[in-house]
Amino acid sequence: MDQLFPTPLANLDPVELVAAETRPAPPDRPWVLVNMVASIDGAIEVEGRSGGLSSRADKAMFHALRQLPDVIMAGAGTVRVENYGPVKLDADAQARRVARGQQALPRLAVVSGRAHLDPASRLFSDPTQRPIVITTTNASSDAVDELRDVADIIFAGSDTVDLRAAFAELREQGMKTLLCEGGPTLNNQLLRDDLVDEWCQTIAPVLTGGNAAQPSTGSPPQVARSLQLARVVVEDDVLLLRYARES
């Protein structure tokens, strides 16, 4: 894995690379990082899943980025399709996190406006890693009650999830960095609410055609957010890009 920008460097360790980057948390919410993989023509899935676009380089960056945050967030649809389970990091990664003053493992947060999640699913299979479910006050009380035994609940918003309010609660709990892994609807809400501080995207050397989903889907924000190119890494024709909010 070689860096082309800002400084050309060869044979980089992605774990060391991302750990050296600065991510200052705002006072009222975590620093929000989105990580996605897409084809050259912008598709984020092949036959409904992102795995068809992944590669050795993308997987290495995916695992490196997962070692950084205090909380990993995904939408309920992504959690179901990708069959999310408890976060796993090796002993060295956990030790590095503890040395930085973090918990050994990041929390996992799932956004579901109606709390329609199966408490018996793999997501909730480890009682030592209780996910956070971010939902609304209008969610079914029966659905919420079923989840209380296996998850911590954050209520934010009534009809739709208020991400800014949810992030304020996470920040109050001491979480300074949040990694969002999609899907595109959740990404779009982050953009509409101007909550994206960093966008990392792997460009797979593939053309898919068709009408596959894009990294962000939905009504566009009123004002487009400009980000600065912060890093370009390449491996085997795969580009790994990092854009960050202007400091």
Predicted features by range, described:
Residues 1-247:
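Enzymes that bind and transform nitrogen-containing heteroaromatic metabolites
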